[in-house]
């Protein structure tokens, strides 16, 4: 099973840029590399930072379906099992390490 099979093409391209640390820009999504840290932008708003030892996720000021989709695509590539979901208009982060916790912009994904 291909890891990226259920992802949008732009999300698999974004993940390749983050994983291999190269700059990428297509439509509303950009990846910028600075000192081995990949910064991911959606509509010009920072939604993630990925370093060799950390993953920081943000909502960029917009808790949209697209933001959540980009974050979940990225999390599938860079964390063992992290994910963002919404229940009753509230965002949550879930992983085997944290369980379900309220999402906050700037949190570290583990």
Question: Which ranges hold each PLM region?
Answer:
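Terminal leader/tail segments of proteins
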Residues: 2-110
């Amino acid at each position: 099973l291909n890891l990226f099979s259920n992802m949008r093409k732009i999300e698999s391209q974004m993940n390749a840029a983050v994983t291999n640390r190269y700059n990428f820009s297509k439509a509303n999504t950009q990846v910028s590399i600075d000192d081995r840290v990949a910064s991911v932008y959606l509509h010009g708003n920072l939604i993630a930072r990925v370093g060799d030892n950390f993953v920081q996720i943000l909502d960029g000021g917009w808790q949209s379906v697209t933001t959540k989709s980009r974050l979940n695509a990225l999390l599938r590539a860079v964390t063992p099992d992290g994910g963002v979901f919404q229940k009753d208009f509230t965002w949550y982060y879930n992983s085997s390490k944290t369980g379900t916790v309220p999402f906050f912009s700037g949190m570290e994904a583990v």
